[in-house]
């Protein structure tokens, strides 16, 4: 199968496909009861008159009870901090860059020295008869000695020239010492810094001396003159390579090594720049057998195919029928792979490369086989020399020393190829027109490589065929298959990419981008995706060779699969990443228009574009615009902001975050200016576009995904840098210190995030952002009708369209409860560094920005809060000590401590940064009063914060909180380095470094674990449905040691573990079978604390712990049962934007739909889709707030809500009206609904509701709104209700130290008052109750003694 088809069918990507977003919640989770809605309130219901009507047949138990939806398990939930992003993105240094030769080199000059002295044998050589005579395949005795010497010299020249035709060759025949010296000096002078090759044939002179001296002649050829190796080395210098073809050549190598060791202290690189090849060891003489030429070593190095075949001929089964002279008649050319000779040379190169790759260390392989073409050829041929000469008891040696290779099994493959060649040779010589049949060698090796791919892994030995795959890329007939297999190999991980690059694959795949073969496009894009996911440095080569145009054309082709085009967008993003030449080349090639064209569907009714493609189109644009004003201008001219802004509502967080990244890089961060002078280059169009971008970013600053919010915070910080001067000016106007002024009627920003939270979208509705931020409090001459039911700001308010109200701090006699505050340090206009655009934009945008960043600084996700604090410090807003006063009906929240009044004075410089442990940031807005404050606006206000500004020394000349921003402490470009870094690009790169073609083994393990848990769950459900449910036995009691008692508890379904938490949001995990603590951690480190609920997500898989805080913040943890191993998966504010939500937010979770429901003292219910990490709002249509929520475990999108006015409502997100049932089951005197739940089993029509007055009402929504059963469980003070998911039992608890367990028929099964001890101590006031999901177990948390008790039936057995 082609890799393109394989990718289409098996490609795995992190972005999930879903339908286009709509205003209403889509029914994207199909359910078995999707069309069977509950009757609408007061609507006709024929079933009400048929009391005994049987409910519809239940669905299969496993479908209804064991939901298949899994959320928050994408790669983004594994973490996207700086460390994760750095590990995911392409590298430009370190181990991955070692594949690229640091100093490519070529041999520029070759010195050939032949000391043959034909017809005169050296005195220390005794020759046998017959003996080896041929030199360069020429018999020197077949012609006159001078002619023979000249012919041999020219032949050696031609043999070397085939390997390096561009080098300069110098030949010396039987030279003197002076001639050799002159030759060496000339070669070095010509070669300069290039390598010089010195070839020495000493067959006509004595062996080298013990000191490593070689011999030459005197002028009259009457004496042998020694040439010290030290002199030779000093003439040739380095880099150089020596070939010594003489007996006892090892003596020369030994002397060289001694010299290198001696000189290593002065020249560390000399040993690496000197390469030696010697024919034999110091004690050996050259072979004299007549089957070899006299210069067998030289023959192997310069004519390997001929030498190999001659040698093999005598050992082949064909030796009797083969004539040696036919070897010289092999048809074809060595550089033509479609001929017999060319194919043999190709196979030989592949085999010797493979042997070297598998035997040598990779750095040595790189140096010898990839740095210099001539050196690589000589070392390939040296491997042949070792094989042939060792058969004659002669061992060639080299420096660097190579391990033995003469018995490597790949030589068997060569022998087979040679034998096939020899068998064809007679026929081809007899019939020159005979059709050439290629060798099966490469086909077989590719098959072997494919077998390895089916069974290999990183932990096993690397595939030895990898160098052969590289060679196969040269052949058009094998290329496609080789590329597909190479793609499969690269997909195995970064280690595979590094191996392929180390073997030398890069120049081959780079060259292939110049081909126009359509069938190669998909696989080449995939291969380049894998390469660039490891090493970014290849971007330079791609642009240099024009490769970027190849990927732009592919990206613009509609016939390719979207996933493949996403890969092309990734490649282009890497090309332009921090590479100005690449940015310019891609911009000139029209990349911006191509990306924008594919970001918007041609037809609005078309299905959603592949999310991965959208993500990488945005990232590509963002990288192209990054720090490149010319490209930014092109984007603005192409209406890029409008197009990209449309993606901010996409269902995939990765797409939204990437769109924010692209928009953020269109925001001008300004340029350093020492005098703050304006630059007239900005035009109105750019200003309007930037306003549009910033407004859009402010609107999504409370997105449900930290990935998105993080990018928004980074982009807004860039905006703060670009508009630093103007934002400071606006902030200074509002926060100008006024001595002894009184601030009245102003809420703190801490309250704005808790009881008075505003959404950025509501801020943008008014022209004055800060005014709208505090509008309900500061509004003058208006009434409460200016505020909408859901707490959002009405633009009809006069204050919402005018300047900010003002006031002064209250006196020191106010409440002593402390809070954290923000102070703006005025900018001293001293010519210091200011990063700012030339022209200010609307001050309302600046005000909205400040208010939004104050909320960002309190984000529940730590990294985002840190960015928000940094952005505020950029505009000179810093923390100061605050004191807030409460109204008579208010009070301190848990976790707030008191400070003395003097804490406002003399603030130390170190306090200029926000306190990382503080969650309350209160701001006093100050402007001259327009009219007296109206006391009407204080009605209902929970807190009023006051801030007193005290004079203190400003150590920073420009008023910035960070000394790094001071002009006296930073260079002119320091501001560029303090901007927080976006992580989305590098984090997204990690997707392509992971396997894309095969599923992970982890998925198989997870599936097996889930199947086992499903089996256990079904068994437990069947048992608990038949149990008596009398919780009479206390099987465990745990003193949690919570200071404020236990607020929530949760029993895990598949392990004997209970999780408990208190009002301070301390989370503790306990094993109740072993009575041992498992883990303890804090939900957060902020001072503003309060817990609402613990929920379990993905209970059948790797479960996650959701901790809902009473202020609406949600944090979700994984690994919470590992001591110290808990990790934050995601965090968000569930009620951001709702001023009246209060601190009593309630939650419930529905696994079937992936929805989290949240509400409180507000008129809306927030439905969070945790798959998309987006929210939709349902109006409750009630006059009071919500006090309890319960999601149906049978029907997706259906949930029940209990209200503060004791009413009950059922909602279904699938119906147009949402509200499907309303009832007031509790008496008018009753207080709020404390607990509500759907009754156990498959019947979705029955619910249970308990009020604080103590009554429990059973309702059947198919009948009248009156309850069909009432239980007076407690006489007031009911604090908790628990409904078992499967067993027919409910439990209630009261503050009067009592727990009661009832059947669904109202029978009281158990009453628990005392601990099962000798003294019979009372159990304590009940704060929380929770049933085990699949067993008859009940956990109860006490409020006064912090005990968590677990109750079971009498026959419960501890494992």
UniProtKB/Swiss-Prot annotation:
Alphabetized GO MF terms = protein-macromolecule adaptor activity
Q: Where is the composition biased (Basic and acidic residues)?
A: 32-50
- List the Gene3D superfamilies: Leucine-rich Repeat Variant, YVTN repeat-like/Quinoprotein amine dehydrogenase
Q: Which residue ranges does the record annotate as region Disordered?
A: 17-64, 782-819
- Polar residues composition bias: residue spans: 782-805
Annotated WD repeat ranges = 1041-1080, 1087-1127, 1139-1178, 1181-1221, 1228-1269, 1273-1312, 1321-1359
Which Pfam families does the protein's record reference? Raptor_N, WD40
Q: Which GO terms describe its cellular component?
A: cytoplasm; TORC1 complex
Gene Ontology annotations of biological process type:
cellular response to amino acid stimulus; cellular response to starvation; positive regulation of cell growth; regulation of autophagy; TOR signaling
| Keywords for this protein | Developmental protein, Growth regulation, Repeat, WD repeat
Q: Where is the composition biased (Low complexity)?
A: 806-819
Outline what the protein does.
Component of TORC1 complex, which is an essential cell growth regulator that controls plant development. Acts by recruiting substrates for TOR. Acts by activating transcription, protein synthesis and ribosome biogenesis, and inhibiting mRNA degradation and autophagy.
Q: Which family does it belong to?
A: Belongs to the WD repeat RAPTOR family.
Please give the subunit comment from the record.
Answer: The target of rapamycin complex 1 (TORC1) is composed of at least RAPTOR, LST8 and TOR.
This one is known as Regulatory-associated protein of TOR 2
Q: What organism does the UniProt record list as the source?
A: Oryza sativa subsp. japonica
């Amino acid at each position: 199968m082609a890799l393109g088809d394989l990718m289409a069918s098996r490609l795995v990507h992190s972005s999930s496909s879903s339908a286009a977003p709509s205003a209403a919640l889509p029914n994207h989770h199909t359910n078995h009861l999707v069309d069977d809605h509950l009757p609408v309130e007061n609507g006709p219901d024929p079933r009400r008159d048929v009391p005994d009507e049987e409910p519809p047949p239940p669905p299969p138990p496993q479908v209804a009870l064991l939901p298949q939806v899994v959320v928050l398990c994408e790669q983004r939930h594994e973490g996207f901090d700086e460390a994760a992003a750095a590990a995911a993105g392409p590298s430009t240094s370190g181990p991955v860059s070692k594949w690229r030769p640091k100093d490519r080199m070529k041999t520029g000059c070759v010195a050939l020295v032949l000391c043959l002295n034909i017809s005169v044998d050296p005195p220390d050589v005794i020759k046998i008869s017959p003996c080896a005579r041929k030199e360069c395949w020429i018999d020197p005795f077949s012609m006159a000695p001078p002619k023979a010497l000249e012919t041999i010299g020219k032949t050696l020249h031609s043999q070397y020239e085939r390997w390096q035709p561009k080098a300069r060759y110098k030949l010396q025949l039987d030279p003197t010492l002076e001639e050799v010296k002159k030759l060496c000096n000339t070669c070095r002078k010509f070669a300069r810094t290039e390598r010089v090759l010195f070839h020495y044939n000493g067959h006509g002179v004595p062996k080298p001396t013990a000191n490593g001296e070689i011999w030459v002649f005197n002028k009259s050829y009457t004496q042998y003159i020694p040439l010290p190796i030290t002199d030779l080395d000093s003439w040739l210098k380095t880099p150089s390579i020596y070939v010594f073809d003489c007996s006892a050549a090892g003596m020369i190598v030994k002397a060289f090594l001694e010299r290198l060791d001696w000189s290593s202290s002065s020249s560390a690189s000399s040993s690496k720049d000197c390469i030696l090849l010697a024919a034999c060891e110091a004690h050996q003489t050259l072979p004299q057998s007549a089957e070899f030429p006299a210069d067998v070593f030289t023959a192997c190095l310069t004519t390997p195919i001929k030498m190999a075949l001659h040698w093999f001929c005598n050992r082949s089964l064909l030796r009797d029928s083969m004539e040696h002279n036919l070897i010289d008649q092999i048809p074809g050319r060595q550089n033509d792979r479609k001929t017999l000779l060319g194919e043999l040379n190709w196979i030989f190169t592949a085999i010797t490369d493979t042997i070297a790759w598998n035997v040598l260390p990779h750095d040595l392989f790189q140096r010898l086989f990839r740095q210099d073409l001539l050196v690589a050829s000589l070392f390939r041929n040296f491997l042949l020399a070792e094989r042939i000469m060792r058969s004659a008891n002669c061992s060639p040696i080299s420096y660097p020393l190579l391990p033995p290779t003469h018995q490597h099994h790949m030589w068997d493959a060569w022998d087979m190829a040679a034998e096939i060649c020899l068998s064809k040779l007679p026929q081809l010589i007899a019939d020159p027109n005979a059709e050439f049949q290629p060798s099966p060698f490469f086909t077989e090796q590719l098959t072997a490589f494919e077998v390895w791919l089916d069974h290999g892994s990183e932990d096993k030995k690397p595939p030895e065929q990898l160098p052969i795959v590289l060679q196969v890329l040269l052949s058009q007939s094998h290329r496609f298959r080789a590329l597909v297999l190479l793609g499969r190999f690269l997909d195995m991980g970064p280690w595979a990419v590094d191996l392929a690059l180390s073997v030398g694959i890069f120049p081959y795949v780079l060259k292939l981008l110049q081909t126009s073969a359509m069938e190669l496009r998909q696989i080449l894009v995939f291969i380049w995706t894998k390469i660039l996911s490891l090493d970014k440095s290849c971007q330079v080569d791609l642009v240099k060779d024009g490769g970027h145009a190849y990927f732009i054309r592919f990206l613009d082709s509609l016939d390719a699969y979207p996933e493949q085009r996403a890969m092309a967008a990734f490649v282009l993003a890497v090309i332009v990443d921090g590479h100005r030449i690449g940015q310019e080349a891609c911009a000139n090639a029209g990349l911006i228009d191509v990306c924008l064209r594919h970001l918007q569907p041609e037809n609005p009714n078309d299905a959603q574009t592949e999310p991965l493609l959208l993500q990488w189109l945005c990232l590509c644009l963002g990288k192209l615009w990054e720090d490149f004003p010319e490209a930014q201008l092109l984007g603005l001219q192409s209406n890029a902001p409008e197009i990209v802004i449309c993606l901010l509502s996409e269902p995939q967080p990765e797409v939204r975050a990437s769109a924010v990244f692209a928009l953020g890089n269109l925001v001008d961060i300004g340029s350093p200016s020492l005098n703050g002078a304006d630059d007239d280059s900005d035009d109105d169009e750019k200003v309007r576009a930037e306003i549009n971008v910033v407004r859009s970013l402010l609107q999504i600053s409370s997105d449900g995904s930290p990935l998105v919010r993080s990018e928004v915070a980074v982009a807004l910080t860039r905006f703060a840098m670009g508009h630093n001067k103007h934002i400071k000016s606006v902030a200074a106007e509002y926060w100008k210190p006024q001595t002894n002024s009184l601030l009245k009627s102003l809420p703190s920003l801490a309250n704005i995030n808790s009881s008075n939270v505003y959404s950025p979208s509501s801020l943008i509705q008014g022209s004055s952002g800060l005014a709208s931020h505090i509008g309900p409090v500061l509004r003058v001459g208006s009434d409460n009708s200016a505020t909408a039911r859901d707490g959002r700001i009405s633009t009809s308010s006069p204050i919402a369209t005018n300047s900010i109200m003002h006031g002064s701090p209250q006196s020191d006699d106010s409440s002593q409860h402390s809070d954290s505050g923000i102070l703006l340090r005025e900018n001293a206009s001293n010519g210091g560094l200011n990063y700012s655009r030339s022209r200010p934009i609307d001050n309302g945008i600046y005000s909205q920005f400040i208010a939004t960043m104050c909320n960002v600084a309190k984000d529940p996700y730590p990294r985002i809060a840190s960015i928000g604090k940094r952005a505020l410090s950029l505009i000179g807003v810093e923390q100061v000590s605050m004191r807030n006063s409460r109204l008579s009906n208010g009070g301190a929240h848990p976790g707030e401590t008191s400070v003395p009044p003097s804490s406002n004075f003399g603030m130390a410089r170190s306090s200029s940064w926000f306190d990382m442990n503080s969650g309350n940031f209160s701001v006093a807005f100050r402007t001259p009063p327009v009219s007296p404050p109206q006391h009407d606006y204080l009605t209902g206000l929970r807190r009023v914060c006051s801030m007193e500004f005290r004079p203190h020394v400003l150590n920073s000349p420009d008023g910035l909180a960070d000394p790094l921003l001071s002009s006296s402490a930073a260079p002119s470009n320091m501001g560029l380095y303090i901007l927080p870094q976006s992580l989305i690009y590098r984090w997204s790169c990690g997707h392509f470094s992971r396997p894309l073609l095969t599923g992970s083994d982890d998925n198989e393990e997870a599936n097996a674990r889930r199947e086992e848990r499903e089996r256990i769950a079904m068994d437990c459900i069947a048992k608990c449905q038949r149990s008596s449910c009398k919780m009479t036995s206390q099987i465990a009691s745990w003193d949690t040691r919570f200071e404020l008692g236990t607020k929530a508890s949760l029993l895990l379904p598949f392990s004997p573990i209970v999780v408990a938490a208190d009002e301070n949001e301390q989370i503790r995990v306990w094993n109740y079978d072993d009575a041992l603590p498992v883990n303890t951690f804090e939900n957060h480190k902020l001072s503003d604390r309060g817990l609402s609920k613990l929920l379990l997500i993905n209970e059948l898989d790797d479960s996650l712990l959701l901790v809902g805080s009473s202020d609406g913040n949600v944090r979700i943890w994984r690994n919470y049962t590992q001591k110290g191993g808990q990790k934050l998966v995601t965090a968000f504010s569930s009620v951001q934007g709702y001023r009246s939500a209060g601190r009593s937010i309630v939650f419930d979770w529905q696994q079937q739909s992936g929805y989290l429901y949240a509400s409180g003292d507000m008129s809306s219910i927030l439905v969070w889709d945790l798959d998309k990490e987006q929210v939709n709002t349902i109006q409750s249509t009630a006059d009071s707030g919500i006090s309890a929520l319960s999601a149906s475990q049978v029907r997706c999108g259906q949930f029940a809500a209990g209200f503060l006015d004791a009413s009950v409502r059922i909602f279904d997100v699938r119906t147009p009206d949402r509200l499907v049932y309303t009832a007031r089951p509790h008496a008018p005197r009753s207080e709020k609904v404390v607990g509500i739940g759907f009754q156990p089993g498959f019947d979705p029509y029955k619910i249970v509701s308990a009020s604080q007055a103590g009554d429990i009402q059973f309702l059947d929504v198919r009948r009248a709104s009156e309850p069909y059963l009432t239980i007076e469980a407690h006489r007031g003070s009911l604090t908790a209700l628990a409904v078992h998911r499967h067993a027919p039992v409910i439990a209630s608890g009261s503050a009067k130290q009592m727990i009661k367990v009832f059947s669904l028929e109202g029978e009281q099964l158990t009453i628990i008052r005392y601990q099962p001890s000798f003294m019979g101590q009372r159990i304590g006031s009940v704060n929380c109750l929770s049933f085990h999901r699949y067993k008859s177990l009940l956990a109860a948390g006490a409020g006064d003694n912090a005990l968590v008790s677990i109750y079971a039936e009498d026959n419960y057995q501890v494992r």
